Amino acid sequence: MLLRSLDCPLDPLEEQDALFDLAQALNTVGGVTTTRPSFDYVAAERAREYMHSALDRTVTLEELAHHSGRDRWSLSRDFRLLFGTSPYRYLTMRRLDLVRSLLIQGQSLVSAALIAGFTDQSHMTRQFSKTYGLSPARWMKMHRR
C-alpha cells in the first residue's frame, strides 16, 4: 500500500502512520510480546478535535501529540484502539465528508479539494476513488438522480 503512492509526495501524517504500521509489524514478526495496552481517551479525543479544526491544512503527528499531551507513538496507538483507524485515515475521511458536502452545495471539484485541505484536485480524486470506488464526478452524477 505504501509503495503504491510513491508517484506523489506523502502527506506527513500519512508517512508517520506508515512508520507506525512498520514498527508494529516488526514487533509482531520479532516476537515481541506486549501486555494489553492502556490508553488515554482524553488525549485521543483532543487529537480528533484538533483534526476537525484543521481540515484545511497539513497536520503532522507531532502537532497532534502536542495538542493531545501524549507522545506521537502512544497517541497513534491510542487513536487506533479507540477510533478503529489511524489518525491519517480519520483525517482523510473527514476531508472527504467535507468534499461531498461542498460538491452538493455546488462547489467545483478544484474548490472543494482545496477547501477540504487536499493538496490538489488530483490528490482528492485519488482518495475519493479509493474510498468510494468511483470518481467524484461520477458520484455527483449519481447523487443528482
Residue ranges and their predicted role:
Residues 4-68, 81-89, 93:
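Short, Lys/Arg-enriched, Trp-marked, Pro/Gly-tolerant hinge/linker segments that flank
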Residues 22-29, 106, 131, 142-143:
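Short, leucine/isoleucine-rich alpha-helical interaction segments at C-terminal helix-coil junctions
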Residues 52, 58-94, 113-142:
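Basic/polar phosphate-binding segments, predominantly the helix-turn-helix DNA-binding elements
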Residues 51-54, 102-106:
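Short helix-to-turn junction characteristic of helix-turn-helix DNA-binding domains
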Residues 8, 57, 105-107, 117:
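Flexible coil/turn residues that form the inter-helical turn or adjacent wing/linker of helix-turn-helix
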